Amino acid sequence: MGFLHVGQDGLELPTSGDPPASASQSAGITGVSHRTQPPCFEGLTSKDLVREEKTRKRKRKAKESGMALLQGLLTFRDVAIEFSQEEWKCLDPAQRTLYRDVMLENYRNLVSLDTSSKCMMKMFSSTGQGNTEVVHTGTLQIHASHHIGDTCFQEIEKDIHDFVFQWQENETNGHEALMTKTKKLMSSTERHDQRHAGNKPIKNELGSSFHSHLPEVHIFHPEGKIGNQVEKAINDAFSVSASQRISCRPKTRISNKYRNNFLQSSLLTQKREVHTREKSFQRNESGKAFNGSSLLKKHQIIHLGDKQYKCDVCGKDFHQKRYLACHRCHTGENPYTCNECGKTFSHNSALLVHKAIHTGEKPYKCNECGKVFNQQSNLARHHRVHTGEKPYKCEECDKVFSRKSHLERHRRIHTGEKPYKCKVCDKAFRRDSHLAQHTVIHTGEKPYKCNECGKTFVQNSSLVMHKVIHTGEKRYKCNECGKVFNHKSNLACHRRLHTGEKPYKCNECGKVFNRKSNLERHHRLHTGKKS
């Protein structure tokens, strides 16, 4: 034997006029004996030659091993029909052509399977006579293009082992239904034209890249009876261990449209599970998975930093269109309304936070002091009281603050901005709280009342300070002299005696004072006003 060569150089078949390579020239699978056949086969048809060769091979194997083919696993070469140099010369052109077609068909069926792992294949003849079972195991190396006359077996990708079997089965009826995947052979001229046209490999349905050179193949999955029924179980006589016997599903059945041979493949060394609902689109930067490619593309914009949607008013950019739609600060639109108090919000998230006021729910608790909050942001802000962290710094005077809002309010001192204006007297204020306090002057309202003496106050802070009179509590102590005060502001004024600080300056004469009340009293000298 020496005709079929499956190894580093793939499948080699001679042209119709060339004799096959000798056994000594064949590389690949070991353990195959070589012989010389009678010199002439004249008068025999090609079918007779094939049948006689098969019979001779079975008898020889049975004699050597004491059993028929079921003794152990066989290789492709063990079951191949091969001829010596003398035998090949005796074949006429029609017989040689038929032989090449048969061998090429078997090779096509092989490369259609996952040849990187061990495969168990059963081939059945549709003639109903002399059904043969063929078992093959091994790894097939496929690479360079090989020509057989005008037909070219172009480069087949090595990643055949990346096949992912995804079949749908109807277990209720156990029938088979036809699914077609057409891959036609190309002539040398067609292959040459496509190469220069820059055609890329066609992505095979099973997950591996192929050039369009495969024959027309019919793929079946269980839904109807077509041809001979292929057994699901693997015979124990094929030396397969219990750990290797896995389910015949997923299975592959391949048939050429000109023959009714079926190949059944069961992966013995590697299970491959296909989850139809698993998230198959994955982003390398973050490892995040998505159900669809469109979601993946949206997520990729975050990594690319691409913000395609821009506000025409302020120029702010957004990753997605829906974020731009939620950007309603310019329109003043507040589509979300609280059912309890009727207050409106521009974002649904703000409404959800607001609802906690009505429910009284405060799920966020400080581990240091046990104080609870209705928002996580408020808890994070509160933590800075314990840590002393002040991450917000004024660029003008380097003063630091624990809250961003405090920094923004402080900046108005440097800019002179007073955005809050009284509608009655047009007086402006830096803080909205100051405007609220000022408005009470015009209304005369004093909503805060002391329960001890009945005195009323414009501001709640004034009421708190007043209550100290009744309790006699003096919580604020000077670290320099030990003097205590009932108000924090009084302690602050007292400290200036130790530091010598006089922050209040008269714009008329430049005189400085350590208290604001002293500066106001001094102003009356210039204006002539009497208290």
Swiss-Prot record:
Domain KRAB: residue ranges: 74-146
InterPro entries, sorted: KRAB, KRAB_dom_sf, Znf_C2H2_sf, Znf_C2H2_type
Zinc finger (C2H2-type): 281-303, 309-330, 336-358, 364-386, 392-414, 420-442, 448-470, 476-498, 504-526
PROSITE patterns linked to this entry: KRAB (PS50805), ZINC_FINGER_C2H2_1 (PS00028), ZINC_FINGER_C2H2_2 (PS50157)
Transcription recorded as keyword: yes
Cross-link Glycyl lysine isopeptide (Lys-Gly) (interchain with G-Cter in SUMO2) per UniProt, renumbered positions: 271
Cellular location(s): Nucleus
Segments for region (Disordered): 1-42
Single Gene Ontology BP annotation: regulation of transcription by RNA polymerase II
Keywords, alphabetical: DNA-binding, Isopeptide bond, Metal-binding, Nucleus, Repeat, Transcription, Transcription regulation, Ubl conjugation, Zinc, Zinc-finger
Molecular function GO terms recorded: DNA-binding transcription factor activity, RNA polymerase II-specific; RNA polymerase II cis-regulatory region sequence-specific DNA binding; zinc ion binding
Pfam families: KRAB, zf-C2H2
Keyword Protease: no
Family: Belongs to the krueppel C2H2-type zinc-finger protein family.
Role noted for this protein: May be involved in transcriptional regulation.
Name listed for the protein in its UniProt record: Zinc finger protein 701
Gene name of the encoded protein: ZNF701
